[in-house]
Amino acid sequence: MANRVDHEYDYLFKIVLIGDSGVGKSNILSRFTRNEFCLESKSTIGVEFATRTLQVEGKTVKAQIWDTAGQERYRAITSAYYRGAVGALLVYDITKRQTFDNVQRWLRELRDHADSNIVIMMAGNKSDLKHLRAVSEEDGQALAEKEGLSFLETSALEAVNIEKAFQTILTEIYHIISKKALAAQEASSNLPGQGTTINVADASANQRRSCCST
């Protein structure tokens, strides 16, 4: 099968999807990257990822979304994939209280393994199943505020707030990267006789200016 060559992009941002098994992470991934939803989707084994290129404030950003398995037996495998992530979408199922109760455990794991500046959004998924709701939107919002996270309720089935969730994460990441670049430029300009360009992009958010094959 021939490789598809992506269009040129300015930034590559790695984002991880985390949360319990069965909360809808894989369908969030497929809805965002392929605009697809599979009613018969099975639990992810190990890790898979997909990409999508989009515009963020005039820059072309390639989002590399990693879908990490929620099952306990795979947590040791997936922890390695937090490395290099600059964003995370922490997902729970609004119809299953236990998945919401486990959010703080996932947050601890994320903060133990990921960069301290990682951008995190919490998503209460399956908002289309309001008649089965076990977690109120107010409870979700309150926990997000307590932990300093952005928050949305989403539906991969009905494509509600999926786009907004990722756009919010990517825009916030871009703002952080831009501020770092500006600060580095200002620091460099204050050094007389220094003509060296400072590269502030790290391995997880490299500024790219060439085509690449996937």
Curated annotation (Swiss-Prot):
Organism: Beta vulgaris (Sugar beet)
GO molecular function: GTP binding; GTPase activity
Pfam families for the chain: Ras
Protein name: Ras-related protein Rab2BV
Gene: RAB2BV
Classification of source organism: Eukaryota, Viridiplantae, Streptophyta, Embryophyta, Tracheophyta
Signal peptide per UniProt: none
PANTHER family: DRAB11-RELATED
Membrane topology: Lipid-anchor
Residues reported in the UniProt entry to bind GTP: 19-26, 67-71, 125-128
Swiss-Prot/TrEMBL keywords: Cell membrane, GTP-binding, Lipoprotein, Membrane, Nucleotide-binding, Prenylation
